[in-house]
């Protein structure tokens, strides 16, 4: 079947329609399909929009319309046209024919937009967040925005691809953070900030047809429990949803990415294992080169060329939808600026900075570093100390085989990676900690 056959005149189409034994036009899907494929008004008019998962009318068909999406009013006009022009009146057959012709005439508006872009060669991704929001123009900010753009492009061309990163813009109210995400979506209908509940059965309807989705309210009220819910939500690659008029639920691969905005600096709950899905960028609107709405047309043109630059990277194939290991390490440290102060980690670090021994255990840290001299640690407190030592403290290496501690018995623990020595040169120490005496050394007795 070919939905884009050359249009014919109405008389030619009528002459080619199947008829009944009595000579009337047959009420068949085939006849309805022939009309939609060849009628001069309807040929090429109906298409399936992959982004919205809906049927669209993509060219004028003789009556005023407010949007491209096929709606009930459009159906009434189409039924009237087919009845008056061809004598076709079976609504179910007409609707089935519309479904077939739309499926054979698919399009994706974001793919079409991105594919038509031509980059002028000027680098903008590196400087965009400084230009509009006053963020630092460093490698981290560049890599953060580039990763987000490539994730959005990948989701458009490869729906459901794995991308669980949220770019989070952090700064005072009125900085233009939400406006940035809205303009980044290119068209306002491709943007949404209406996602309020992640456990809603109809969450797919909130994502449907959108490319850039801002989570502002959820990030503003985030706590440890809700952050875990957001993490789980970001990790999903599809929704399983049954559209009301369909018989069976179907997988709906995600075609969108998520951005976060927060006015509060410490918007991330304390998570010593890392919040790798959240990439925070601090913005300083007073340092911005322009306000993003000062000249909206110019801002949109700038962003359009930034998408063109990102498309060059995407088409080259030389990218990954993840930070490099070095940038991951930087991110983990950087995220601590956006968490509440970790007082227990600070107390343990202060204790270790003054401690002269070469190994410690969790029980020792509980009693001596956290000042619980007369208490016994609970299991969850031991786990917390282990997490701090393994995630937050550097220069100490975990040993899994228990060793003897004079006050705490045999315990697993941590040892200094570079133990302090009495002589300035660690290589001069023997295994037992004594200095080897050579023939040239004079004994002091």
Whereabouts are the PLM-identified features?
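Residue-level preference for alpha-helix termini and adjacent loops
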Residues: 40-41, 47-50, 56-57, 62, ...
């Amino acid at each position: 079947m070919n939905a884009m056959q050359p249009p014919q005149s109405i008389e030619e189409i009528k002459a080619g329609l199947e008829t009944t034994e009595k000579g009337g036009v047959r009420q068949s899907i085939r006849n309805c399909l022939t009309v939609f494929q060849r009628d001069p008004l309807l040929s090429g008019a109906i298409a399936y929009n992959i982004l919205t998962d809906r049927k669209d009318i993509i060219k004028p068909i003789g009556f005023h319309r407010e949007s491209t999406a096929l709606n009930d009013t459009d159906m009434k006009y189409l039924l009237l046209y087919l009845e008056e022009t061809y004598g076709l009146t079976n609504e179910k057959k007409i609707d089935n024919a519309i479904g077939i012709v739309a499926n054979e005439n698919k399009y994706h508006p974001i793919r079409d937009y991105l594919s038509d872009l031509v980059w002028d060669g000027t680098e903008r991704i590196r400087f965009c967040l400084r230009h509009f929001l006053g963020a630092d123009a460093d490698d981290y900010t560049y890599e953060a925005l580039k990763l987000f753009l490539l994730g959005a492009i990948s989701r458009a061309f490869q729906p459901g691809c794995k991308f669980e990163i949220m770019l989070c813009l952090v700064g005072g109210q009125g900085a233009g953070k939400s406006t940035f995400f809205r303009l980044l979506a290119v068209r306002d209908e491709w943007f949404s900030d209406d996602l309020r509940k992640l456990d809603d059965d109809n969450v797919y309807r909130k994502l449907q047809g959108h490319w850039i989705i801002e989570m502002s309210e959820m990030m503003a009220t985030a706590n440890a429990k809700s952050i875990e819910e957001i993490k789980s939500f970001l990790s999903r690659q599809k929704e399983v949803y049954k559209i009301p008029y369909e018989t069976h639920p179907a997988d709906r691969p995600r075609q969108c990415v998520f951005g976060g905005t927060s006015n509060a600096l410490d918007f991330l709950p304390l998570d010593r294992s890392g919040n790798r899905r959240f990439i925070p960028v601090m913005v300083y609107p007073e340092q911005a080169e322009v306000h993003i709405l000062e000249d909206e047309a110019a801002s949109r043109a700038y962003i359009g060329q930034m998408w063109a630059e990102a498309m060059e990277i995407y088409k080259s194939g030389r990218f990954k939808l993840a930070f490099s290991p070095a940038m991951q390490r930087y991110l983990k440290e950087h995220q601590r600026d956006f968490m509440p102060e970790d007082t227990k980690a600070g107390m343990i670090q202060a204790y270790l900075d003054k401690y002269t021994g070469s190994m410690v255990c969790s029980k020792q840290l509980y009693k001596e570093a956290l000042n619980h001299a007369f208490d016994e640690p609970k299991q969850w407190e031991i786990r917390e100390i282990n997490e701090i030592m393994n995630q937050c403290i550097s220069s100490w290496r975990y040993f899994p085989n228990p060793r003897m501690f004079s006050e705490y018995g045999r315990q697993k623990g941590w040892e200094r990676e570079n133990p302090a020595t009495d002589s300035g040169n660690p290589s001069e120490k023997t295994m037992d900690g004594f200095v080897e005496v050579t023939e040239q050394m004079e004994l002091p007795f």
